Regions:
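Active-site-adjacent pocket-lining segments in enzyme domains
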Residues: 2-8, 12, 19, 26-39, ...
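Mixed-charge, low-complexity segments
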Residues: 43-44
Length: 165
């Protein structure tokens, strides 16, 4: 089974990965969905779900097939920067990374979106949340965009996010 890792943290937007995870985790897809956190302590989502991560950032499998970064206010507060080594690993190994809502700003701030087509909540908001962002010319006013193994979507695009490859 190919593993899909969904990054969870206190305050993660639990509805954003719901459609894609339900489809990927279905029988006969060849995929299984697992969660990754900074540690293996229970995380509480925006909706109040208590979720214990399957993996921590120190013990995740190297052969995962997709990394999903969900939204949440922790991205705005710069509390999720510790996931950067996992994202770097995925990008360097050409493993697709999906980012939705505020997680897109993290991708922008760290240079992943500077040279590829992408979406996000709004260009103006992204620029306020990602001062080092240089991808203005590649921003598309679209619900979701896929380019170079990176999938981006605004916070209202959970279905479109699930459909991108």
């Amino acid at each position: 089974m190919k593993e899909v890792l969904v990054f969870i943290f206190d305050g993660f937007a639990d509805w954003e990965p719901a459609y894609i995870c339900a489809e990927l985790n279905a029988p006969d897809t060849g995929y299984t969905v697992k969660t990754i956190g900074f540690d293996k302590k229970a995380k509480v989502s925006m909706g109040g779900f208590h979720v214990i991560p399957d993996y921590s950032i120190n013990d995740y499998p190297s052969d995962f097939s997709l990394l999903i970064l969900t939204g949440g206010t922790a991205w705005i507060e710069q509390k999720n920067n510790g996931i950067l080594p996992v994202v770097d690993y995925a990008v360097n190994k050409h493993i697709p990374v999906g980012a939705i809502c505020n997680a897109v700003n993290f991708m922008a701030e760290n240079g992943y979106l500077d040279t590829i087509k992408h979406s996000g909540n709004t260009l103006e908001f992204m620029k306020t949340q990602a001062p080092h962002y240089k991808g203005d010319n590649n921003f598309l006013e679209a619900q979701a965009v896929s380019d170079s193994n990176i999938i981006t979507a605004n916070g209202s695009a959970t279905l479109e996010f699930a459909k991108k490859k």
